[in-house]
Amino acid sequence: MLVWLAEHLVKYYSGFNVFSYLTFRAIVSLLTALFISLWMGPRMIARLQKLSFGQVVRNDGPESHFSKRGTPTMGGIMILTAIVVSVLLWAYPSNPYVWCVLTVLIGYGIIGFVDDYRKVVRKDTKGLIARWKYFWMSVIALGVAFALYLAGKDTPATELVVPFFKDVMPQLGLFYILLAYFVIVGTGNAVNLTDGLDGLAIMPTVFVAGGFALVAWATGNMNFANYLHIPYLRHAGELVIVCTAIVGAGLGFLWFNTYPAQVFMGDVGSLALGGALGIIAVLLRQEFLLVIMGGVFVVETLSVILQVGSFKLRGQRIFRMAPIHHHYELKGWPEPRVIVRFWIISLMLVLIGLATLKVR
């Protein structure tokens, strides 16, 4: 929005030309989202406390979590607000990739909001009925995926980028829709599963979004895209603004979510952020890179799948509790130790993922 305004004002004052620089807008997008989160935090927490929107804790969870009962949840509202406002201010409104991300972000945020509302108001730990949750998540994911397929059919926008192989970029055809669907829905649920400890989900989200900001910049720059042997996508550059907004909003939220948390993001935050990371990976044609950089989310999800599968097939559990972060809690690890070690692993995986762009 401000970019368009600056384009009209630059003829009166050349200094407004700074708004055309992607790096400048990326920095101010991050700072804008950060300050909005920090400003909203105390007000959001006070409002949630007044409404008695407190966390519902399962009775079969770790005993250390019982003290979290009643902590304000649905703090993801301030994350989404910060991201959306920052993106609308600093990104080109005409960019279709930006609107794809905002569609998934807001759509999944609404689904998460309904889920959280049922939990905190009706005191139902299950929240929104699973089949309805997945139905609406699927509708949004398939709708966006189908639109992207029609717009980018038989172009680099629907090719599959394979790590380590610079000349292997098969055209996916209709399989693109299926792949995009699983990436968006899967990542939304993966981040949701990871959000079980104070700050555990938000920092890996920040790391992955920061990594994708660099990838988006390279993908939207023809020279760097050719140098790295990745598809050049002319709309990809504006995703830098989206990614840095996620980073800023995430850091602002972490100020209040760090151990011991004053507020939880809830499903309104985790589903939305996961879906956003998923669609960003799809738009950049970096689904494999998401698996590497988001390895913490992948392991958390696999631990649940393996736990459920093992119990149904063998009647035995692999872990003391799933997702796997609870397993380490029950082994005696203090919560801050689990959180920080997962952060370290996440940062390492993001750096490894970025390195694969050059190893081709």
Swiss-Prot record:
Keyword hit for Zinc: no
Pathway the protein acts in: Cell wall biogenesis; peptidoglycan biosynthesis
Transmembrane portions of the chain: 26-46, 72-92, 94-114, 132-152, 168-188, 199-219, 236-256, 263-283, 288-308, 338-358
Keywords for the protein's UniProt record, in alphabetical order: Cell cycle, Cell division, Cell inner membrane, Cell membrane, Cell shape, Cell wall biogenesis/degradation, Magnesium, Membrane, Metal-binding, Peptidoglycan synthesis, Transferase, Transmembrane, Transmembrane helix
One Pfam short name: Glycos_transf_4
Bilayer topology term: Multi-pass membrane protein
GO biological process: cell division; cell wall organization; peptidoglycan biosynthetic process; regulation of cell shape
GO molecular function, one term: UDP-N-acetylmuramoyl-L-alanyl-D-glutamyl-meso-2,6-diaminopimelyl-D-alanyl-D-alanine:undecaprenyl-phosphate transferase activity
Family: Belongs to the glycosyltransferase 4 family. MraY subfamily.
Protein name: Phospho-N-acetylmuramoyl-pentapeptide-transferase
Organism: Enterobacter sp. (strain 638)
